[in-house]
């Protein structure tokens, strides 16, 4: 039988959430979260033990991301880091590798690729984005043999406690406040219904399930109908092409069934491109992506050539905006002006360099945001520390971040000024029940 444990969010989170945009209560197993490569979550947090470097000391930074088909923003960020700082194999600083598209089924490969970074004697930090299942197990192995390496976990897809204990720093989107604000944004954009597209595996991820529960409750409070839909998990045998084909074939029937004033949201990157294309063609609404970015799905969905604009987010967003407006999505489709995955990856690269040279502190929120700001001029990043739902303890090494929603043809929506009601900060949900409910939702899971 599954072990269940109720953990409650401290009221201390409420005050912090007035400043930003993730957390609430859930029922989770904080010992083992799915298959983690055969390793239990560490009972005690471990941190890197490194010496401050001098100018000229060798420094390599490892980056592990998904492939361009599953995680384009993170992949492009790693390539940009190589362009800026050089390839480690050619005398530069950055060593980049990718984990398999079917990382859930090929978890040992994922673990081995991350751990292999530590074989480089000049490796000083390893950054994983997105931190898919297997990341914590890999970090534990690295810590055992190379305690001097700084370990950075970005957008964790494993148990929260496990991610925090095995990493020196965890950065993620603020999904609790977004759970409310995305629904508020959808209503402001004209939606009367909200369709949440996912699959059971994603609903076993604590913060994604929590966000979904908050979205459903927010729909009740704000007068929208909440619709739960399934689409195939790309990590199953159906793969990315099959999952994308399913969304492409079903988005118009969903719009026909639920109406054009339905806001569609998906939790998977691979689903995003066909969803965007279908939403525009059908005249529906799309607030923002799971991991918002102008290049998450939009360029391919609307045939926007941005190759000569790499890293110039204002230019990229302007080109995407033209295409979206031309496709009829003005005022109905949005994103963040700067990519979360891209910004966090490059910001983390700069942060660890400053930390290794004794110029910044790894878990200092101002330092973290300053490094991200190097790539997001004009963005107003909001940050808050995650609070453990069992103990009420503020986690100094777990920072949650957010931006305002940018609506094409309209501009910023002002979601950063929306106060999230207190009830969403203290919700109690059953993680197992949410996953089981998702298994019964309309659509196919690929399992």
Where are these regions (language model features)?
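An alpha-beta-alpha
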Residues: 78, 175-228, 352
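Extracellular/periplasmic periplasmic-binding protein-like sensory domains
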Residues: 218-226, 273-357
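Hinge/cleft segment of the Venus flytrap/periplasmic-binding protein
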Residues: 44-46, 317-447
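Extracytoplasmic "Venus flytrap"
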Residues: 42-111, 127-133
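Periplasmic-binding protein-like
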Residues: 61-65, 120-132, 149-154, 195-198, ...
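Hydrophobic alpha-helical segments within soluble ligand-binding/sensing domains
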Residues: 45-49, 54, 168-196, 246-249, ...
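Flexible loop/hinge segments that line or gate small-molecule binding clefts
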Residues: 141-173
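Bacterial lipoprotein signal-peptidase II cleavage site
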Residues: 23-35
């Amino acid at each position: 039988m599954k072990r269940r444990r109720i953990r409650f969010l401290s009221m201390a989170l409420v005050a912090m959430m007035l400043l930003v945009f993730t957390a609430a209560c859930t029922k989770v197993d904080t010992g083992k979260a799915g298959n983690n490569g055969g390793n239990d979550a560490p009972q005690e947090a471990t941190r890197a033990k490194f010496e401050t470097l001098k100018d000229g000391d060798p420094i390599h930074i490892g980056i592990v991301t998904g492939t361009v088909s599953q995680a384009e923003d993170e992949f492009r960020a790693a390539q940009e880091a190589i362009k800026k700082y050089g390839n480690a194999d050619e005398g530069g600083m950055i060593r980049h590798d990718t984990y398999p598209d079917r990382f859930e089924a090929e978890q040992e490969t994922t673990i081995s690729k991350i751990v292999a970074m530590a074989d480089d004697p000049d490796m000083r930090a390893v950054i994983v984005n997105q931190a898919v299942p297997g990341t914590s197990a890999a970090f534990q192995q690295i810590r055992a043999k190379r305690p001097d390496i700084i370990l950075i976990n970005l957008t964790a897809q494993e148990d929260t406690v496990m991610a925090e204990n095995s990493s020196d720093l965890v950065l993620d989107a603020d999904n609790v406040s977004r759970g409310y604000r995305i629904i508020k944004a959808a209503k402001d954009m004209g939606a009367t219904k909200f369709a949440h597209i996912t699959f059971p595996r994603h609903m076993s991820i604590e913060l994604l399930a929590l966000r979904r529960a908050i979205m459903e409750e927010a729909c009740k409070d704000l007068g929208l109908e909440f619709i739960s839909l399934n689409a195939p998990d790309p990590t199953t045998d159906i793969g990315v092409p099959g999952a994308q084909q399913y969304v492409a074939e079903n988005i118009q029937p969903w719009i026909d069934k639920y109406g054009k004033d339905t806001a569609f949201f998906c939790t998977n990157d691979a689903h995003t491109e066909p969803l965007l294309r279908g939403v525009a063609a059908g005249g529906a609404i799309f607030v923002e992506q799971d991991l918002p970015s102008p290049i998450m799905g939009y360029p391919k969905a609307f045939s926007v050539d941005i190759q000569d604009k790499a890293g110039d987010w204002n230019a990229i967003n302007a080109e995407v905006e033209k295409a979206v407006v031309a496709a009829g999505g003005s005022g109905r489709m949005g994103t963040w002006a700067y990519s979360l995955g891209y910004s966090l990856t490059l910001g983390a690269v700069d942060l660890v360099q400053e930390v290794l040279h004794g110029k910044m502190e790894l878990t200092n929120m101002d330092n973290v945001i300053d490094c991200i700001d190097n790539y997001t001029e004009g963005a107003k990043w909001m940050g808050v520390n995650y609070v453990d739902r069992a103990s009420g303890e503020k986690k100094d090494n777990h920072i949650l971040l957010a931006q305002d929603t940018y609506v094409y043809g309209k501009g910023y929506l002002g979601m950063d000024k929306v106060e999230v009601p207190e009830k969403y900060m203290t919700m109690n949900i059953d993680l197992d029940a949410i996953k089981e409910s998702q298994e019964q939702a309309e659509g196919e899971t690929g399992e």
